[in-house]
Amino acid sequence: MKKLNLSEFIKGSVGKDNPLQPPKIIAEAGVNHEGSMDLAKLLVDQAAEGGADAIKFQTYKAETLASRDSPPYWDTTLMQETTDSQFKLFQKYDKFWKKEFETIKLHCDSVGIEFLSTPFDIESA
């Protein structure tokens, strides 16, 4: 059975008579790499295989997002490790910085997918 390539399916629906450009498919990786370069590269590979045009990560440091005393506002009931602080949750996933994202960008280039990241502050831009 042929795998469904979401990008081909959606872009194919635009049609030849439609003057609009086909949509860009952006896979949202966020911080789902959990600080693992191997997992980040796997997310890139799977997004490319699935037909995404780009993959988007998130760039931030916990210190710029939340007070150390802020209570968690994510539902942590399904997490293996619960926490009493939003700061600690952000800190758990802020392990990548410019060097790591440069490595991911090179991997994106090698598999033919555009690298994007949402910066959460000036320094992350």
Segments (PLM) and residue ranges:
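N-terminal amphipathic alpha-helix/helix-capping segment at the start of soluble metabolic enzymes
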Residues: 1-26, 101
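Generic structural "secondary-structure junction" signal
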Residues: 6-8, 12, 33, 62, ...
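Hydrophobic faces of well-ordered beta-strands that scaffold small-molecule active sites
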Residues: 25-29, 55-57, 115-118
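Active-site beta-loop-alpha junctions enriched in small/polar residues
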Residues: 30-32, 58-62, 120-122
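Active-site glycine- and acidic-residue-rich loops that bind
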Residues: 32-38
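Alpha/beta enzyme core
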Residues: 39-57, 76, 106, 110, ...
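Glycine-rich, proline-tolerant flexible connector loops at the mouths of alpha/beta enzymes
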Residues: 53-95
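Active-site beta->alpha loop and helix N-cap motifs at the rims of alpha/beta catalytic domains
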Residues: 80-125
